[in-house]
Protein backbone atom coordinates (compact mmCIF):
# COMPACT_ATOMS: atom_id res chain seq x y z
CA UNK A 1 0.00 0.00 0.00
CA UNK A 2 1.43 3.35 -0.99
CA UNK A 3 0.87 6.75 0.61
CA UNK A 4 1.64 9.86 -1.45
CA UNK A 5 3.30 12.77 0.42
CA UNK A 6 4.38 15.80 -1.63
CA UNK A 7 6.01 13.78 -4.40
CA UNK A 8 7.62 11.31 -1.99
CA UNK A 9 6.40 7.79 -1.43
CA UNK A 10 6.07 5.93 1.84
CA UNK A 11 6.64 2.24 1.15
CA UNK A 12 6.58 -0.71 3.52
CA UNK A 13 9.95 -1.97 4.65
CA UNK A 14 12.55 -2.88 3.58
CA UNK A 15 12.52 -0.01 1.09
CA UNK A 16 12.16 2.72 3.77
CA UNK A 17 11.86 5.40 1.10
CA UNK A 18 10.54 7.67 3.84
CA UNK A 19 14.10 8.79 4.47
CA UNK A 20 15.27 8.81 0.88
CA UNK A 21 16.70 12.31 1.18
CA UNK A 22 17.73 12.01 4.82
CA UNK A 23 20.22 9.89 6.76
CA UNK A 24 19.03 6.40 7.70
CA UNK A 25 17.03 5.98 10.86
CA UNK A 26 19.12 5.95 13.97
CA UNK A 27 18.34 6.15 17.69
CA UNK A 28 17.61 9.73 18.75
CA UNK A 29 19.06 11.47 21.92
CA UNK A 30 16.73 13.37 24.67
CA UNK A 31 -18.93 64.22 41.92
CA UNK A 32 -21.65 65.50 44.10
CA UNK A 33 -21.95 62.62 46.39
CA UNK A 34 -18.50 61.34 46.98
CA UNK A 35 -17.14 59.99 43.73
CA UNK A 36 -16.02 56.38 43.89
CA UNK A 37 -12.31 56.22 44.54
CA UNK A 38 -10.10 55.02 41.71
CA UNK A 39 -7.10 52.84 42.55
CA UNK A 40 -3.71 54.50 42.54
CA UNK A 41 -2.61 52.76 39.34
CA UNK A 42 -5.68 54.10 37.52
CA UNK A 43 -5.38 57.77 38.54
CA UNK A 44 -1.74 58.53 39.22
CA UNK A 45 -0.40 60.90 36.57
CA UNK A 46 2.19 59.35 34.34
CA UNK A 47 4.84 61.79 35.62
CA UNK A 48 4.30 60.55 39.19
CA UNK A 49 5.17 56.97 38.37
CA UNK A 50 8.72 55.85 38.97
CA UNK A 51 10.96 57.17 36.21
CA UNK A 52 12.07 53.70 35.20
CA UNK A 53 8.73 51.95 35.75
CA UNK A 54 7.28 49.80 33.01
CA UNK A 55 3.86 51.32 33.64
CA UNK A 56 5.08 54.82 32.82
CA UNK A 57 6.95 53.58 29.77
CA UNK A 58 3.85 51.84 28.45
CA UNK A 59 1.46 54.72 29.21
CA UNK A 60 3.80 57.17 27.46
CA UNK A 61 4.64 54.89 24.53
CA UNK A 62 4.07 55.80 20.89
CA UNK A 63 1.35 53.15 20.30
CA UNK A 64 -0.66 54.58 23.23
CA UNK A 65 -0.28 58.09 21.82
CA UNK A 66 -1.52 56.83 18.45
CA UNK A 67 -4.52 55.23 20.19
CA UNK A 68 -5.26 58.55 21.91
CA UNK A 69 -5.20 60.36 18.57
CA UNK A 70 -7.51 57.74 17.04
CA UNK A 71 -10.03 58.21 19.84
CA UNK A 72 -9.81 62.01 19.66
CA UNK A 73 -10.03 61.92 15.86
CA UNK A 74 -13.15 59.75 15.78
CA UNK A 75 -14.76 61.90 18.48
CA UNK A 76 -14.01 65.13 16.57
CA UNK A 77 -14.96 63.75 13.15
CA UNK A 78 -18.30 62.28 14.18
CA UNK A 79 -19.36 64.89 16.74
CA UNK A 80 -20.78 62.07 18.87
CA UNK A 81 -20.68 62.22 22.66
CA UNK A 82 -18.00 60.06 24.22
CA UNK A 83 -20.47 57.31 25.11
CA UNK A 84 -21.10 56.97 21.36
CA UNK A 85 -17.65 57.61 19.91
CA UNK A 86 -15.95 54.98 22.11
CA UNK A 87 -18.18 52.12 20.84
CA UNK A 88 -17.86 53.44 17.28
CA UNK A 89 -14.04 53.52 17.51
CA UNK A 90 -14.06 50.02 18.96
CA UNK A 91 -16.31 48.59 16.25
CA UNK A 92 -14.30 50.30 13.50
CA UNK A 93 -10.97 48.99 14.78
CA UNK A 94 -12.25 45.47 15.38
CA UNK A 95 -13.95 45.40 11.99
CA UNK A 96 -10.95 46.73 10.08
CA UNK A 97 -8.22 44.83 11.94
CA UNK A 98 -9.40 41.80 13.86
CA UNK A 99 -12.21 40.55 11.61
CA UNK A 100 -9.87 39.87 8.64
CA UNK A 101 -7.36 38.27 11.00
CA UNK A 102 -10.08 36.13 12.59
CA UNK A 103 -11.18 34.98 9.13
CA UNK A 104 -7.54 34.12 8.33
CA UNK A 105 -7.31 32.19 11.60
CA UNK A 106 -10.35 30.11 10.67
CA UNK A 107 -8.87 29.59 7.19
CA UNK A 108 -5.65 28.15 8.64
CA UNK A 109 -7.43 26.00 11.22
CA UNK A 110 -9.75 24.59 8.55
CA UNK A 111 -6.78 23.55 6.40
CA UNK A 112 -5.10 21.96 9.41
CA UNK A 113 -8.29 20.05 10.23
CA UNK A 114 -8.52 18.77 6.66
CA UNK A 115 -4.97 17.40 6.95
CA UNK A 116 -5.83 15.14 9.90
CA UNK A 117 -6.87 12.06 7.85
CA UNK A 118 -3.61 12.23 5.88
CA UNK A 119 -1.63 12.68 9.09
CA UNK A 120 -3.29 9.61 10.61
CA UNK A 121 -2.41 7.54 7.53
CA UNK A 122 1.21 8.68 7.64
CA UNK A 123 1.38 7.95 11.37
CA UNK A 124 0.16 4.39 10.83
CA UNK A 125 2.70 3.67 8.07
CA UNK A 126 5.53 5.31 9.99
CA UNK A 127 4.72 3.34 13.12
CA UNK A 128 4.91 0.09 11.14
CA UNK A 129 8.23 1.02 9.55
CA UNK A 130 9.79 2.08 12.84
CA UNK A 131 8.61 -1.15 14.50
CA UNK A 132 10.26 -3.27 11.78
CA UNK A 133 13.49 -1.27 11.85
CA UNK A 134 13.60 -1.39 15.67
CA UNK A 135 13.27 -5.16 15.51
CA UNK A 136 16.05 -5.40 12.90
CA UNK A 137 18.49 -3.15 14.77
CA UNK A 138 17.56 -4.11 18.31
CA UNK A 139 16.43 -0.66 19.42
CA UNK A 140 14.93 -0.20 22.85
CA UNK A 141 11.30 0.92 23.11
CA UNK A 142 12.50 4.36 24.18
CA UNK A 143 14.77 4.77 21.14
CA UNK A 144 12.05 3.55 18.80
CA UNK A 145 9.55 5.96 20.33
CA UNK A 146 11.91 8.95 20.05
CA UNK A 147 12.74 8.05 16.45
CA UNK A 148 9.05 7.82 15.61
CA UNK A 149 8.30 11.20 17.21
CA UNK A 150 11.24 12.92 15.50
CA UNK A 151 10.29 11.71 12.03
CA UNK A 152 6.58 12.27 12.62
CA UNK A 153 7.25 15.91 13.52
CA UNK A 154 9.32 16.30 10.37
CA UNK A 155 6.64 14.79 8.14
CA UNK A 156 3.86 16.88 9.67
CA UNK A 157 6.00 19.98 9.20
CA UNK A 158 6.41 19.07 5.52
CA UNK A 159 2.63 18.82 5.20
CA UNK A 160 2.20 22.27 6.76
CA UNK A 161 4.78 23.71 4.36
CA UNK A 162 3.14 21.98 1.40
CA UNK A 163 -0.31 23.38 2.23
CA UNK A 164 1.02 26.65 3.71
CA UNK A 165 -0.99 26.22 6.91
CA UNK A 166 1.33 26.05 9.90
CA UNK A 167 -0.86 26.31 13.03
CA UNK A 168 1.32 29.11 14.43
CA UNK A 169 -0.10 31.36 11.72
CA UNK A 170 -3.48 31.04 13.44
CA UNK A 171 -2.06 32.87 16.48
CA UNK A 172 -1.44 36.12 14.59
CA UNK A 173 -4.88 37.34 15.76
CA UNK A 174 -3.78 37.16 19.40
CA UNK A 175 -0.49 38.97 18.75
CA UNK A 176 -2.38 41.86 17.12
CA UNK A 177 -5.58 41.96 19.16
CA UNK A 178 -4.04 41.81 22.65
CA UNK A 179 -1.58 44.72 22.17
CA UNK A 180 -4.32 46.80 20.52
CA UNK A 181 -6.60 46.13 23.52
CA UNK A 182 -3.84 47.18 25.92
CA UNK A 183 -2.93 50.35 24.01
CA UNK A 184 -6.56 51.46 23.74
CA UNK A 185 -7.10 50.79 27.45
CA UNK A 186 -4.08 52.90 28.41
CA UNK A 187 -5.16 55.65 26.01
CA UNK A 188 -8.58 55.86 27.65
CA UNK A 189 -6.95 55.80 31.07
CA UNK A 190 -4.77 58.77 30.07
CA UNK A 191 -7.74 60.68 28.65
CA UNK A 192 -9.86 59.95 31.72
CA UNK A 193 -7.25 61.10 34.25
CA UNK A 194 -5.83 64.15 32.46
CA UNK A 195 -2.61 62.32 31.69
CA UNK A 196 -3.17 62.30 27.93
CA UNK A 197 -0.22 63.26 25.78
CA UNK A 198 -2.20 65.97 24.06
CA UNK A 199 -2.65 69.70 24.63
CA UNK A 200 -6.35 68.99 25.02
CA UNK A 201 -5.77 66.44 27.78
CA UNK A 202 -7.57 68.19 30.62
CA UNK A 203 -10.45 69.39 28.43
CA UNK A 204 -10.93 65.80 27.29
CA UNK A 205 -11.09 64.70 30.91
CA UNK A 206 -13.83 67.27 31.51
CA UNK A 207 -15.68 66.10 28.40
CA UNK A 208 -15.50 62.50 29.55
CA UNK A 209 -16.79 63.50 33.00
CA UNK A 210 -19.96 64.76 31.29
CA UNK A 211 -19.89 62.42 28.30
CA UNK A 212 -21.64 59.38 29.69
CA UNK A 213 -25.26 58.30 29.57
CA UNK A 214 -27.83 56.60 31.78
CA UNK A 215 -26.28 55.36 35.02
CA UNK A 216 -22.67 55.91 33.90
CA UNK A 217 -22.92 59.65 33.16
CA UNK A 218 -19.35 60.25 34.38
CA UNK A 219 -16.95 58.24 32.23
CA UNK A 220 -13.96 59.21 34.39
CA UNK A 221 -15.40 57.42 37.45
CA UNK A 222 -16.03 53.72 38.07
CA UNK A 223 -19.52 52.36 37.50
CA UNK A 224 -21.13 52.47 40.98
CA UNK A 225 -23.85 50.02 39.94
CA UNK A 226 -21.44 47.35 38.62
CA UNK A 227 -23.74 46.88 35.62
CA UNK A 228 -20.95 47.45 33.09
CA UNK A 229 -18.44 45.16 34.87
CA UNK A 230 -20.96 42.34 35.30
CA UNK A 231 -22.10 42.68 31.68
CA UNK A 232 -18.45 42.43 30.62
CA UNK A 233 -17.99 39.22 32.60
CA UNK A 234 -21.18 37.68 31.22
CA UNK A 235 -20.23 38.37 27.60
CA UNK A 236 -16.70 37.04 28.09
CA UNK A 237 -18.05 33.85 29.68
CA UNK A 238 -20.55 33.52 26.84
CA UNK A 239 -17.71 33.69 24.31
CA UNK A 240 -15.84 30.96 26.18
CA UNK A 241 -18.86 28.68 26.44
CA UNK A 242 -19.76 29.06 22.75
CA UNK A 243 -16.22 28.02 21.82
CA UNK A 244 -16.33 25.06 24.21
CA UNK A 245 -19.73 23.87 22.99
CA UNK A 246 -18.33 23.51 19.48
CA UNK A 247 -15.46 21.28 20.59
CA UNK A 248 -15.64 17.55 21.14
CA UNK A 249 -13.07 15.64 23.15
CA UNK A 250 -10.83 18.47 24.34
CA UNK A 251 -7.30 17.61 25.41
CA UNK A 252 -6.19 18.10 29.01
CA UNK A 253 -4.25 21.22 28.00
CA UNK A 254 -7.32 22.69 26.27
CA UNK A 255 -9.38 21.95 29.38
CA UNK A 256 -6.87 23.79 31.59
CA UNK A 257 -6.86 26.75 29.21
CA UNK A 258 -10.66 26.84 29.26
CA UNK A 259 -10.74 26.93 33.07
CA UNK A 260 -8.08 29.64 33.08
CA UNK A 261 -10.03 31.84 30.65
CA UNK A 262 -13.21 31.33 32.66
CA UNK A 263 -11.39 32.40 35.82
CA UNK A 264 -9.97 35.47 34.08
CA UNK A 265 -13.45 36.40 32.82
CA UNK A 266 -14.77 36.35 36.39
CA UNK A 267 -11.68 38.14 37.75
CA UNK A 268 -12.19 40.96 35.25
CA UNK A 269 -15.48 41.89 36.97
CA UNK A 270 -13.99 43.34 40.19
CA UNK A 271 -11.10 44.83 38.21
CA UNK A 272 -13.56 46.57 35.88
CA UNK A 273 -15.41 47.93 38.91
CA UNK A 274 -12.32 49.94 39.96
CA UNK A 275 -11.35 51.66 36.70
CA UNK A 276 -12.93 54.60 34.82
CA UNK A 277 -16.18 53.71 33.09
CA UNK A 278 -14.69 54.81 29.76
CA UNK A 279 -12.28 51.87 29.92
CA UNK A 280 -14.98 49.40 30.92
CA UNK A 281 -17.22 50.69 28.13
CA UNK A 282 -14.39 49.98 25.68
CA UNK A 283 -13.82 46.52 27.14
CA UNK A 284 -17.55 45.74 26.97
CA UNK A 285 -17.88 46.93 23.36
CA UNK A 286 -14.74 45.05 22.35
CA UNK A 287 -16.04 41.81 23.87
CA UNK A 288 -19.46 42.30 22.27
CA UNK A 289 -17.89 42.83 18.84
CA UNK A 290 -15.71 39.77 19.47
CA UNK A 291 -18.81 37.70 20.26
CA UNK A 292 -20.51 38.98 17.10
CA UNK A 293 -17.47 38.13 14.99
CA UNK A 294 -17.32 34.67 16.53
CA UNK A 295 -20.93 34.01 15.55
CA UNK A 296 -20.49 35.56 12.10
CA UNK A 297 -17.54 33.30 11.33
CA UNK A 298 -19.74 30.27 11.95
CA UNK A 299 -22.10 31.26 9.16
CA UNK A 300 -21.65 28.93 6.14
CA UNK A 301 -22.32 31.81 3.77
CA UNK A 302 -19.75 34.10 5.38
CA UNK A 303 -17.17 31.31 5.53
CA UNK A 304 -17.70 30.68 1.83
CA UNK A 305 -17.36 34.42 1.16
CA UNK A 306 -14.02 34.37 3.00
CA UNK A 307 -12.97 31.24 1.07
CA UNK A 308 -12.54 29.23 4.24
CA UNK A 309 -12.29 25.54 3.25
CA UNK A 310 -15.16 23.26 4.22
CA UNK A 311 -14.37 20.77 6.97
CA UNK A 312 -15.97 17.68 8.41
CA UNK A 313 -16.93 19.59 11.56
CA UNK A 314 -18.81 22.32 9.67
CA UNK A 315 -22.55 22.58 10.20
CA UNK A 316 -25.27 23.85 7.91
CA UNK A 317 -27.21 25.08 10.96
CA UNK A 318 -24.48 26.38 13.32
CA UNK A 319 -26.70 28.73 15.34
CA UNK A 320 -29.36 26.09 15.91
CA UNK A 321 -26.62 23.67 16.99
CA UNK A 322 -25.15 26.21 19.44
CA UNK A 323 -28.56 26.90 20.96
CA UNK A 324 -29.31 23.19 21.28
CA UNK A 325 -25.94 22.48 22.91
CA UNK A 326 -26.35 25.45 25.26
CA UNK A 327 -29.86 24.33 26.18
CA UNK A 328 -28.67 20.79 26.85
CA UNK A 329 -25.71 21.85 28.98
CA UNK A 330 -27.18 24.67 31.04
CA UNK A 331 -30.99 24.56 30.88
CA UNK A 332 -32.37 21.07 30.25
CA UNK A 333 -29.94 19.06 32.35
CA UNK A 334 -31.36 17.77 35.58
Curated annotation (Swiss-Prot):
InterPro entries hit by this protein: YidC/ALB3/OXA1/COX18, YidC/Oxa/ALB_C
> What's this protein's function?
Mitochondrial membrane insertase required for the translocation of the C-terminus of cytochrome c oxidase subunit II (MT-CO2/COX2) across the mitochondrial inner membrane. Plays a role in MT-CO2/COX2 maturation following the COX20-mediated stabilization of newly synthesized MT-CO2/COX2 protein and before the action of the metallochaperones SCO1/2. Essential for the assembly and stability of the mitochondrial respiratory chain complex IV (also known as cytochrome c oxidase).
State the GO CC annotations: mitochondrial inner membrane
Q: Which domain of life is it from?
A: Eukaryota
Could you tell me where this protein is found in the cell? Mitochondrion inner membrane
Taken from the record's topology, the Mitochondrial intermembrane segments are: 246-263
Q: List the Pfam families.
A: 60KD_IMP
- Principal location: mitochondrion
Family affiliation: Belongs to the OXA1/ALB3/YidC family.
The annotated subunit structure for this chain is: Found in a complex with TMEM177, COA6, MT-CO2/COX2, COX20, SCO1 and SCO2. Interacts transiently with MT-CO2/COX2 during its maturation. Interacts with COX20 in a MT-CO2/COX2-dependent manner.
Instruction: Name the source organism.
Output: Pongo abelii (Sumatran orangutan)
- Name used for this protein in its record: Cytochrome c oxidase assembly protein COX18, mitochondrial
Q: Which residue ranges traverse the bilayer? A: 168-188, 225-245, 264-284
An annotated GO BP:
mitochondrial cytochrome c oxidase assembly
Mode of membrane association: Multi-pass membrane protein
